[in-house]
Curated annotation (Swiss-Prot):
Keywords: Cytoplasm, Methyltransferase, rRNA processing, S-adenosyl-L-methionine, Transferase. Specifically methylates the N4 position of cytidine in position 1402 (C1402) of 16S rRNA. It catalyses: cytidine(1402) in 16S rRNA + S-adenosyl-L-methionine = N(4)-methylcytidine(1402) in 16S rRNA + S-adenosyl-L-homocysteine + H(+). Its EC number is 2.1.1.199. Disulfide bonds: none annotated. This is Ribosomal RNA small subunit methyltransferase H. The keyword rRNA processing applies. It is found in: Cytoplasm. One of its GO terms (molecular function) is rRNA (cytosine-N4-)-methyltransferase activity.
Length: 305
């Protein structure tokens, strides 16, 4: 299907440069989205090069199917499944995390509090519970825990109680506008320039899609599929994601000693950290949604996974 929403790929040139492209190599775009990174990457591959992409979103799959290049293939799977590819087969893995502009701007997807739509938020609409279905039955304690942990919302308890009150008085929440209204009434202190529903919507989206758990699985899988010298490039958009990526790279970039066996040889590092990159002022001015992006880069060593 053809999107009518504008999508600008964040850190496009920087991400492809960070992959240090080998024209004959096999690359993995673990989060195809609308294909900005994939298309530029393909343009730098030789006839022998290959690109395998992953995405859970059916709209992304439809977009990917418009690419007829025989060097390209798309899998309708989340990126935690990239470990199914042959070991040490990839010269680079790229992950562009979070939700895309077309997903946010399409009211039918239910990701945004700025327009009314069904309260869904699933990346893959063919499976799993929608946010509306989950909120209909979740306890106050569970809702508060999710909103606090994944949204870092200090009014999580008040929001959860307000959702429960709304369920009791008027039935389950069905739309994004209904949820945004409930949250606005529960969050008493406003952050400058930020809608009061921002943290709750982020929390529910992350939870319903198991985003952080799947990110951890995908990072672990990248160690298996990357060949020595292969690059891992990850773009994140909020502190919860970036913390996981940062800690993973740091943990794999140092020798680890087993305290239970002090005379044993340390586990050698499996990644070499190559730093982080933020969008330029010019990119932020052209695309304000890029402001929070952080790209971290690491290189696979020859130590087995």
């Amino acid at each position: 299907m053809q999107d009518t929403w504008t999508h600008r790929t964040v850190l496009l040139n920087e991400a492809i440069a960070a992959l240090h492209i080998n024209p004959d190599g096999h690359y993995i775009d673990a989060t195809f989205g609308r294909g900005g990174h994939s298309r530029l990457l393909l343009s730098q591959l030789s006839p022998q090069g290959r690109l395998t992409a992953f995405d859970k979103d059916l709209d992304a799959i439809a977009e990917a199917q418009t690419i007829t290049d025989p060097r390209f293939s798309i899998r309708h799977e989340g990126f935690m499944h990239l470990g199914q590819l042959p070991a040490a087969s990839a010269a680079g893995v790229l992950m562009d995390l979070g939700v895309s502009s077309p997903q946010i701007d399409n009211p039918v997807r239910g990701f945004s509090f700025r327009s009314e739509g069904p309260l869904d938020m699933r990346m893959d609409t063919t499976r799993g519970q929608s946010v509306a279905e989950w909120l209909a039955d979740a306890s106050i304690e569970t809702m508060a825990e999710v909103i606090r942990e994944y949204g870092e919302e200090r009014f999580a308890q008040q929001v959860a109680k307000a959702i429960d009150r709304r369920r009791q008085e008027r039935g389950p929440l069905r739309t994004t506008a209904e949820l945004a209204e409930v949250v606005a009434g529960a969050v008493k202190t406003r952050e400058p320039g930020k809608d009061p529903a921002t943290r709750t919507f982020q929390a529910l989206r992350i939870f319903i899609n198991a985003e952080l758990e799947e990110l951890q699985q995908a990072l672990e899988a990248s160690l298996k599929v990357l060949q020595p010298g292969g690059r891992l490039v990850v773009i994140s958009f909020h502190s919860l994601e970036d913390r996981i990526v940062k800690q993973f790279i740091a943990g794999q970039s140092r020798e680890v000693f087993d305290r239970r066996a002090p005379f044993a040889a340390p586990k050698a590092m499996r990644l070499k950290a190559l730093g982080r990159i933020k969008p330029s002022e010019e990119e932020i001015a052209a695309n304000p949604r890029s402001r929070s992006a952080v790209m971290r880069v690491a290189e696979r060593t020859g130590v087995s996974a």
